[in-house]
């Protein structure tokens, strides 16, 4: 990762941090190398990161485990329930056909009252990232996986009765969005 990649990643983590409390059991989808856990430093036991591009030699660290694989099918059966599910710059990598299984997996693994924290860039970011990649200022991790995601889809994917939107805000000059959902008690 370049300095700019890390800067943008840290910005997303800072936006998520207020919604993650000390001791929360966290599931980080698209965890990369576990940076969210390292930045938080206070996640509860049983916290888990999952990412299909983790190197096969990736090792779990004290306080959290890392699993190479796809969500939800590769989450260990013993995992969860979680207080928080984080998807920081991840949702746009899911094809539309996977939104249903994604939402169902999140509903199954998130405790009632638990929080799901999502950051998703606006479609304009893809053009900006293309330029930054050409200038070698960012690596543009998995840009080929962006599927033309529209931000307005987000509340519909994680809809009632299983989820309740409790916060939506834009940041990074409107180029990124934060969504926070609460898992309802409805099944």
Model-derived features: where do they sit?
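Conserved N-terminal segment of class I S-adenosyl-L-methionine
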Residues: 1-80, 84-86, 100-103, 142-148, ...
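Short catalytic micro-motifs in class I SAM-dependent methyltransferases
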Residues: 89-93
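A structural motif corresponding to the C-terminal end of an alpha-helix
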Residues: 157-163
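A short glycine-rich, Lys/Arg-flanked "PGG" loop and its adjoining helix->strand segment in the class I
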Residues: 100-112
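Helix-to-beta-strand junctions that scaffold the AdoMet/dcAdoMet cofactor pocket
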Residues: 21, 94-95, 110-112
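Short, glycine-/aromatic-enriched active-site segment of Class I SAM-dependent methyltransferases
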Residues: 123-144
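Glycine/Thr-rich phosphate-binding loops of Rossmann-like dinucleotide-binding domains
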Residues: 36, 75, 95, 126-127
């Amino acid at each position: 990762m370049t300095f700019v990649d890390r800067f943008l990643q840290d910005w997303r983590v800072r936006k998520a941090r207020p919604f993650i409390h000390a001791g929360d059991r966290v599931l980080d989808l698209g965890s990369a190398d576990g940076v969210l856990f390292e930045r938080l430093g206070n996640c509860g036991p049983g916290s888990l990161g999952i990412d299909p591009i983790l190197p096969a030699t990736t090792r779990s660290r004290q306080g959290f485990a890392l699993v190479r694989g796809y969500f939800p099918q590769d989450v260990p059966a013993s995992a969860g329930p979680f207080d928080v599910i984080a998807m920081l710059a991840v949702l746009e990598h899911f094809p539309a056909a996977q939104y249903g299984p994604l939402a169902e997996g999140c509903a199954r693994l998130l405790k009632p009252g638990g929080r799901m924290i999502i950051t998703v860039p606006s479609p304009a970011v893809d053009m900006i990232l293309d330029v930054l990649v050409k200038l070698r200022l960012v690596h543009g991790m998995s840009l080929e996986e962006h599927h033309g995601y529209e931000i307005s889809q987000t509340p519909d994917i994680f809809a009632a009765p299983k989820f309740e939107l409790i916060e939506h805000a834009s940041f990074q000059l409107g180029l990124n969005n934060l969504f926070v959902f609460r898992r309802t008690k409805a099944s």
